[in-house]
């Protein structure tokens, strides 16, 4: 619960490593209730090493509340990651911004499903950008719902591979293809 006028920064970072042979499973659930005029910034990062994850995030925004969510995700090998975010903009003049950036490599799979529900005069923007490599699979399913005539909700989604021109430019500086890809991925997720 975030009280009236309060400001909260929530940071969650995950990286799995080790010599063990078992699966590394991570299924976090975050629920936030935001009172009038409150502000919350969530930064959720998962960079490799987690075999399977299902992230559930729910937010309920009151009057003049603002929520900013930044999600960064990288999967590789046969890893699977699902992220479900539901934000209910219940208060007048509430604001939501979700930015998701992800990279899927090898045979990994990703699914991102953000939902913005405008129940009052509000503004929301969802942006999902993914880089897909090798044999990976990525699904981006932004969902918007307006239950009020003054709800202004926008979503954008883009999935694509690394541009060959970017690789070539970095290779002219002496990087090999693998190093060039690493530079592009790091910059994309930063």
Feature roles, as predicted:
Residues 1-175, 186-190:
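Conserved beta-strand/loop scaffold segments within soluble protein domains that form the structured core
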């Amino acid at each position: 619960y975030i009280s009236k006028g309060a400001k909260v920064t929530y940071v969650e970072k995950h990286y799995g490593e080790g010599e063990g042979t078992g699966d590394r499973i991570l299924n976090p659930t975050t629920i936030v209730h935001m009172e009038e005029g409150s502000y919350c910034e969530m930064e959720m990062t998962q960079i490799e090493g987690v075999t399977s994850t299902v992230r559930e995030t729910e937010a309920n925004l009151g009057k003049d509340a603002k929520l900013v969510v930044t999600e960064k995700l990288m999967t590789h090998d046969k890893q699977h990651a699902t992220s479900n975010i539901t934000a209910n903009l219940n208060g007048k003049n509430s604001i939501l911004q979700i930015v998701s950036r992800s990279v899927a490599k090898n045979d990994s799979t990703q699914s991102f499903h953000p939902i913005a529900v405008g129940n009052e005069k509000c503004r929301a923007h969802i942006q999902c950008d993914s880089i897909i490599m090798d044999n990976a699979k990525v699904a981006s399913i932004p969902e918007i719902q307006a239950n009020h005539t003054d709800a202004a909700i926008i979503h954008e989604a883009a999935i694509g591979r690394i541009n060959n021109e970017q690789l070539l430019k970095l290779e002219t500086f002496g990087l090999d293809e693998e190093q060039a890809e690493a530079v592009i991925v790091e910059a994309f997720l930063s």
